[in-house]
Swiss-Prot record:
InterPro entries: CstA, CstA_N. GO terms for biological process: cellular response to nutrient levels; cellular response to starvation; peptide transport; plasma membrane pyruvate transport; protein transport. GO terms for molecular function: pyruvate secondary active transmembrane transporter activity. One of its GO terms (cellular component) is plasma membrane. This is Peptide transporter CstA. Keywords: Cell inner membrane, Cell membrane, Membrane, Peptide transport, Protein transport, Stress response, Transmembrane, Transmembrane helix, Transport.
């Protein structure tokens, strides 16, 4: 295509995007079609990638395709494997796309579709994709080192140890929240529990099949896996309807918690080829296939958004999560716009598979844009269902139906209707029946709500093929595999971080080839996130209300730390005139997270502040005036949970401020030095036969 043709294409895309955004903005007080949001989003993503991503690659970072990458330099067929860019894009996307882009936008829908949509689009273009791309570049230039090692190398050993401790603590919180979403989705759901449990022996079979029966036949085993996944969903319906089998898969939240802790330990110590790799194949195909199917379904169905652009809860009084639009919307959405967790993948993991530095923009910037698109579709799925159903599913049980309520559904319908979102008990019972569940009341965590929206979209788009219950449990399986893949990989990553920390005390514990050291570190990791998971599951307010804000604050603070590192590297590269690219999102993230952290820790409002909530419930215990919806032990649990969350929030705030001071100190020192001081691996030219190397490595990979 000639230059004028290219200009015409981008002009048309710009006009389409502007028109779609204008239509959304001008239709105030009217219900609009979800298609407008999808069109506007795709146009913005394409324009951002083509222009802003390219600007960062060429001008800010001066990406050099002739420079040898660590994957080529250390090509060992194990950790360092130069990988085809399309294959690597899939691996990177599978690693970064956890629960955040699925759940955060669903929870954010409490305030209406408009605030979440704006932040998802602006945040990913200016912050999230920038972080992923720049961290990938920085790590690639330093032999694929991890985030903590990069901070240590560029800012000094003290800052490095602080960053490593913070990364481990944040990873623990992230894993606890991810696991809690699975628990909330599977509690008292025999169909869902059976289907997810079925994938464990299936993954083990696939691992043995690939290792011993048909080595290297990934496509073949993936087809087998897909067939058995469909069988698992169908047979799950039979199990749920069986009075004999259903009780064997009907578990409480606490029972599922201990099962997940045990699973997490076993999955982290088993060989990667036996469970993790096959589950990756399953989840990657399911993720990409479902995302494409959902996008096509929205195009076919063109559903109307029933959630208003702004709800009454923008004032911070919402039942799903508490706090004003600023700053809490920005920490609630989390991964769909910007995620610190991605920095742990973009450093240390993906750089060791990057065949050419010139592909970093496609993998880093492009991969994050894809995740944001997933988040947009999650937002759409949540906003097309009846708002009354949305609030009945996501509000805490203590709010909808206090302990001892005879008719929970009727009570929930009455409470939600009093908020201005009219809903009847018959409607709630009908939806529960259609999706094959005993109840949909207070199915907090976002995942069940997303599954309901997805089920109706896919059911309608395919002309009624299979019933709604099938598609609901298909969506639950999709979400569970999405999340469990991250729990598996995250537990292993946390184990490596913990072994690095334990190695400071006892060098022998740092050895990853030592079975006792591995078992000890893994046990400590799963007990750490398992503890927070248990606290969230038994929390009378649903867990999400307290743990998700802590997760959001910690995750966004980690993103701020990663962007601080990127800004420091630009100063040390003598490219400080471009440092604004990293400093602007850093400043915004620090403002949001420190404001949110301060309010969650110290706000006197008992609906917002952790300490205020703890003091309120402690006063009830001391006075003996226990509300009917709680027991004394539940109040004691709430007091402890909130005080612990306050302590962690304060710790994360101190860490990010200290690292900000180290960043300023390092940047000022770099300005005084007339020469570049960035500690990059010395330049080596890319071998001429790099394409042949990538092709050969494909088999090893």
């Amino acid at each position: 295509m000639n230059k004028s043709g290219k200009y015409l294409v981008w002009t048309v895309l710009s006009v389409m995007g502007a028109f779609a955004l204008g239509y959304i903005a001008l239709n105030r007080g009217e219900q609009i079609n979800a298609l407008w949001i999808v069109v506007a989003s795709v146009c913005i993503y394409l324009i951002a990638y083509r222009f802003y991503g390219l600007y960062i690659a060429k001008n800010v970072l001066a990406v050099d395709p002739t420079r040898m990458t660590p994957a080529v330099r250390h090509n060992d067929g194990l950790d360092y494997v130069p990988t085809d860019k399309k294959v690597l894009f899939g691996h990177h996307f599978a690693a970064i796309a956890g629960a955040g882009p699925l759940v955060g936008p669903v929870l954010a829908a409490q305030m209406g579709y408009l605030p979440g949509m704006i932040w998802l689009l602006a945040g990913v273009v200016l912050a999230g994709a920038v972080q992923d791309f720049m961290v990938l570049f920085v790590s690639t230039r330093r032999d694929g080192r991890s985030l903590g090692e990069l901070v240590k190398e560029e800012m000094g050993p003290t800052a490095g140890v602080i960053a490593l401790v913070a990364c481990f603590m944040i990873m623990v919180i992230i894993l606890a929240v991810l696991a809690m979403i699975v628990v909330k989705a599977l509690t008292h759901s025999p169909w869902g529990t059976y289907t997810v449990a079925f994938t464990i022996p299936l993954a083990l079979f696939m691992g043995i099949y690939l290792r011993y029966l048909r080595p290297g036949r990934i496509g073949e085993v993936s087809v087998i896996g897909l067939v058995f996944l469909i069988f698992a969903i169908i047979s799950g319906g039979w199990v749920a309807e069986s009075p004999t089998w259903a009780p064997y898969f009907d578990f409480t939240g606490v029972q599922l918690t201990w099962m997940l802790v045990g699973y997490g330990f076993v999955a982290a110590v088993l060989p990667v080829w036996l469970l993790l790799a096959p589950r990756d194949y399953l989840s990657t195909f399911l993720k990409i296939g479902t995302i494409v199917g959902l996008a096509v379904g929205i195009l076919i169905m063109r559903p109307t958004l029933t959630m208003p652009a702004l709800t009454k809860f923008v004032d911070g009084t919402g039942p799903v999560w508490t706090g004003n639009l600023f700053p809490f919307l920005f920490i609630t959405i989390a991964c769909g716009a910007v995620s610190g967790f991605h920095a742990l993948i973009s450093s240390g993991t993906t750089p060791k598979m990057l065949a050419n530095e010139g592909q970093a923009c496609f993998i880093g910037y492009g991969g994050m844009l894809m995740e944001s698109f997933v988040a947009i579709m999650a937002l759409v799925s949540a906003c097309i269902i009846d708002p009354g159903v949305y609030f009945a599913m996501n509000s805490p049980m203590a709010v909808l139906a206090p302990a001892g309520t005879a008719d929970v559904v009727a009570s929930a319908a009455q409470v939600v209707s009093s908020w201005g979102f009219s809903i009847t008990p018959d409607t709630l019972n009908q939806i529960a029946s259609e999706v094959g569940e005993q109840s949909i009341i207070s199915r907090a965590g976002g995942a069940p709500t997303l599954a309901v929206g997805m089920a109706y979209i896919l059911h309608g788009a395919l002309g009624g093929m299979m019933d709604v219950a099938f598609w609901y449990h298909f969506a639950i399986l999709f979400e569970a595999l999405f999340i469990l893949t991250a729990v598996d990989a995250g537990t292993r990553a946390a184990r490596f971080m913990l072994q690095d920390l334990l190695g400071v005390v006892s060098p022998g514990l740092k050895r990853t080839d030592s079975l006792p050291a591995n078992l000890l570190a893994t046990a400590l990791c799963v007990l750490a996130w398992g503890y927070f998971l248990h606290q969230g599951v038994v929390d009378p307010l649903g867990g999400i209300n307290t743990l998700w804000p802590l997760f959001g604050i910690a995750n966004q603070m980690l993103a701020g730390m990663a962007l601080m590192l990127c800004a420091v590297v630009l100063f040390k590269m003598k490219r400080q005139r471009y440092a604004w690219v990293a400093l602007v999102p850093t400043a915004w993230l620090l403002i949001c997270t420190l404001t949110a952290g301060w309010q969650k820790a110290f706000s006197p409002d008992a609906k917002v502040g952790f300490l205020a909530i703890a003091n309120k419930f402690q006063a009830m215990i001391d006075s003996g005036n226990i509300p009917s919806q709680y027991t004394e032990s539940q109040l004691a649990q709430l007091v402890f949970n909130n005080r612990l969350d306050a302590g962690l929030t304060i710790f994360f705030m101190v860490v990010v401020v200290v690292l900000a001071l180290f960043s300023i100190k390092t940047a000022l020192a770099a300005l005084k030095d007339p020469k570049p001081t960035a500690k990059e691996t010395p330049y080596e030219p890319m071998p001429e036969n790099v394409e042949e190397i990538v092709a050969q490595a494909k088999g090893a990979h």
